[in-house]
A protein has these predicted regions:
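C-terminal catalytic "cap/lid" subdomain
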Residues: 1-238
């Protein structure tokens, strides 16, 4: 393998809200800048990026107590847009042309998601940040990531998590948990592993979308994975 050439041309990067969470606020702009610098390095090698960002640093629907689930999920969608605009602003400051596209129309500060427009932006060197998930309740941003990946023809979904791989159990609770380097969609579902929600896993399996789960404790991990480093967990078909 040519270690100077990226393994993937078009990537859907899923960032959790926790990944960009600040200790003294909801956003860590210094860390977002580090992410931008790494994306720029990848883009200089011809890599195209679509990004789905979660909202866990601001709001989680399941934390809404007795709140109506649909309303709670609507709040989550709005929170993803706050994160998306924050990413866009930081990327632009770092010299990256970025556009926010949302599943729910918010024309004052984002473009509506249109598949062909998103692909045109990618082909023209822009990072496309998808807000509002899929625009419907009861659907996670993990599921939104694999759906958008299918729509834009991404080579891989990079799931940047606050844990460095998929394990046989939660390593924070079970000291005997073992890291998994490669696993199939069916195995994840059969073993009930909490790598991502089952809807996202099933959709990825049905549409043969490869997923690479890795830790974002170091932003350089994005570059390393794209360049073919063996780290984290690769999820794919049989």
């Amino acid at each position: 393998m040519d270690t100077n050439s990226p393994v993937y041309k078009r990537v859907l990067l899923k960032l959790s809200g926790e990944a960009i969470n600040g200790k003294d606020g909801i956003l860590n702009f210094d860390y977002i800048k580090e992410i931008a610098d790494v994306l720029k390095k990848c883009m200089d090698k011809g890599v195209q990026f679509g990004i789905i960002v979660g909202a866990g640093n601001i709001w989680r629907g399941r934390s809404g107590g007795e709140m109506d689930r649909v309303k709670a999920d609507h709040m989550g969608m709005l929170a993803t847009c706050i994160n998306a605009v924050a990413l866009q602003e930081s990327f632009i400051r770092c010299g990256i042309d970025a556009v926010v596209m949302t599943a729910v129309e918010m024309k004052s500060f984002a473009k509506p998601f249109v598949r062909d427009d998103a692909i045109d932006c990618l082909n023209n060197g822009k990072v496309v940040i998808f807000g509002c998930g899929l625009g419907i309740p009861f659907v996670s941003t993990d599921t939104a990531a694999v759906v958008r990946a299918a729509e834009i023809g991404a080579d891989i979904v990079l799931m940047a998590k606050n844990i460095d791989a998929i394990y046989t159990a939660d390593p924070r609770k079970d000291k005997n948990a073992e890291k998994i380097s490669s696993i199939t969609y069916k195995e994840i579902l059969a073993r009930g592993l909490q790598a991502m929600d089952s809807t996202a896993t099933s959709f990825a399996m049905d549409n043969n979308i490869a997923i690479h789960v890795f830790g974002l404790d170091n932003c350089e991990n994005i570059y390393k994975v794209i360049m073919g480093a063996e780290m984290g967990t690769v999820v794919k078909g049989e």
